[in-house]
Curated annotation (Swiss-Prot):
GO molecular function: neuropeptide hormone activity
Protein name according to UniProt: PBAN-type neuropeptides
Subcellular location: Secreted
Any matching Pfam family: PBAN
GO biological process: neuropeptide signaling pathway; pheromone biosynthetic process
Entry-linked InterPro entries: PBAN, Pyrokinin_CS
Pro-peptide region(s): 51-94, 172-194
Modified sites of kind Leucine amide: L47, L103, L123, L159, L169
Family per similarity comment: Belongs to the pyrokinin family.
């Protein structure tokens, strides 16, 4: 037991002397990595990893120098005369453009009214009410009032169709026969329909 205490004491003295023999007064700017003077006694987070240093006096001085340089640059920029700065050139019309009408048209073309021309409509199309047509065309292409359906304004028929067009099957029913109140059935899973 005495021998073990003596060996342990010698080991502790050797460890303390080796640690104190190395320079432990490490400054903030000194290298704290794996390649420092302390060698194998450095217990860092990971070998070779460099830690991010918080802004020290050196970083603060560099930051203040950058601020001074930016302030000086702004001062000298404000001293420049405004005439030397690049402005957009003034846009002036130097050439007068003469517009020529297309061939076959004249300036008074818009004033001319439509003349009576023989007009043949496309198959299945009806003439619009505000479209000018000759009296002969109106008599030839006017349909019977029974064939004209109010839905033709919303649904344009296919070519050549003059019959009544129903968009869905079963829509020919008269809704006068249906009851005014509609019975609402409740579902078995207690949901309500509105």
């Amino acid at each position: 037991m005495y021998v073990q205490r003596k060996c342990l004491f010698l080991l502790a003295v050797f460890t303390i002397s080796s640690v104190s023999g190395n320079n432990n007064d490490v400054k903030d700017g000194a290298d704290r990595g794996a390649h420092s003077d302390r060698g194998g006694l450095w217990f860092g987070p990971r070998l070779g990893k460099r830690s991010l240093r918080i802004a020290t006096e050196d970083n603060r001085q560099a930051f203040f120098k950058l601020l001074e340089a930016a302030d000086a640059l702004k001062y000298y920029y404000d001293q420049l005369p405004y005439e030397m700065q690049a402005d957009e050139p003034e846009t002036r019309v130097t050439k007068k453009v003469i517009f020529t009408p297309k061939l076959g048209r004249s300036i008074a073309y818009e004033d001319k009214s439509f003349e009576n021309v023989e007009f043949t409509p496309r198959l299945g199309r009806r003439l619009a009410d505000d479209m000018p047509a000759t009296p002969a065309d109106q008599e030839i292409y006017r349909q019977d009032p029974e064939q004209i359906d109010s839905r033709t304004k919303y649904f344009s028929p296919r070519l050549g169709r003059t019959m009544n067009f129903s968009p869905r099957l079963g829509r020919e029913l008269s809704y006068d026969m249906l009851p005014n109140k509609i019975r609402v059935a409740r579902s078995t899973n207690k949901t309500r329909s509105t």
